[in-house]
Amino acid sequence: LSTSNNHALVIGASIAGLCAARVLSDFFHRVTLIERDELPSVPHGRATVPQDRHLHMLMARGANEFENLFPGLLTDMVAAGVPMLENRPDCIYFAAAGHALGTGHTLRKEFTAYVPSRPHLEWQLRRRVLELDNIEIVRGLVIEPRFEPTTQTVSGVLVAPPDDDDGAEPQFLAADLVVDAAGRGTRLPVWLSKWGYQRPAEQSMDIGINYASQQLRIPDGLIQEKVVVAGVAHDRSLGLGMLCYEDGTWVMTTFGVAGAKPPPTFGEMRALAERLLPARFNAALAQSEPIGAPMFHAFPASKWRRYDKLDRFPAGIVPFGDAVASFNPTFGQGMTMTSLQAGHLRRALQSPHGDLATQLNRATAKTTYPVWTMNAIGDISFHHGLTQSPPAWWRPAGALFDQFLGAAETDPVLAEWFLRRFSLLDSLYIVPPPRLIGRTIAHNVGLWLRERRQSASSRGRTLTAPRSP
């Protein structure tokens, strides 16, 4: 990190960039976000962020982290109509890998989550960032950072004017630190190669996700749950999710994995819902009213750029958010992982020892690894995911977890444990402790014995039934 903390610059003003800017504002005199889009003054989607029209989950852990970063955020979201999920049995219907979790009981531990639309959450964060005197958002397109070979340092970025200002010349903005929060389209690996550094190795998981989403109105009172999820399974490549948003509308997102195409019309989406959801949801959908046309999006692969493995890294620049790791969006963990990385950035900036990039990249890897690994096991086991040389233990682990989820259908203790771990609340590792593994085995053995007794009883009744004369 430069000895001068005069100016920090962030590439991208989406959720990751806003989180980074909020942290940087406590350490730098000025923070500038460079954003190519003209940002809306109200909650509204952007053409360059096509994923914001589809279902987004803000996990309970992410809500806590965002509140720490932006105090008062959760209260303001609820005041704006954002649904809040508490530990009541009627808040969520969650079917994971073909197993409908037994969440029909009040959770024993506190569990509070929030369901903002992606545009609303981004608007809330942007509003708070712009209230800080030392942060500004500048519209423009980053051409490339300026690299100083003599000091092996990035000293700023060259910024092109927005598309509607063709006559203006590119401008150089000097900075003591550049944060690349450009998302999945990051060009940092290319820049590193150009500057004489090694590109980071990439771990990828080909999942071939295709989305189709429909906004709709459902009359009040027909659905008690605010979150409805029926994920894909090893024998079914289609799934769906429904969320109730802050304006009272719902979004219904259908998705396919391994290249499977989701239904393209609302009528066909409803037909899929009839196959995947209990009858009460379909009765409500029968009275729903679609708003606008369906919207589509594709997510071919999850990627993790292993900056933590590099021996050399230039000073004055760090990667952040999806520029480091982009997760399978059907797990809904991306925004929460970004909020965790904001904490890593703060601690790295506070540390008097070591270089910033090394500390941030290593801390990010420590929280990315368990979530990436658990997601990869799920992708291999249930989503027909493809990756290079997967560890031999992944598929057996997926099969064991399938047994756990099967038991969690009727055991609320197991269901609550999974829901909290899936929300990244208690730990980033989804590894059941021995007592829960024992509970799972006992539960499944009990089910097997009951089925055996019922089968034997049925055969006995058949053998002793009187013959017809």
What are these regions (language model features)?
Residues T3-I34:
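N-terminal Rossmann-like FAD-binding beta1-loop-alpha1 element of flavoenzymes
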Residues V23, F27, P43-F94:
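N-terminal FAD cofactor-binding segment of flavoenzymes
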Residues E38-P40:
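Helix N-cap at the beta1-alpha1 junction of Rossmann-like dinucleotide-binding domains, i.e.
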Residues M57-L58, R108-R127, A181, R187, ...:
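Short beta-strand to alpha-helix junction loop
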Residues A97-R118, G156, T254-V257:
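Helix-loop-beta segment of a Rossmann-like dinucleotide-binding subdomain
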Residues E131-L272:
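Predominantly flavin-linked oxidoreductase catalytic cores and closely associated redox partners
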Residues A260-M374:
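FAD/FMN-dependent oxidoreductases across multiple families
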Residues R346-P469:
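C-terminal helical "tail/cap" subdomain of flavin- and related membrane-associated enzymes
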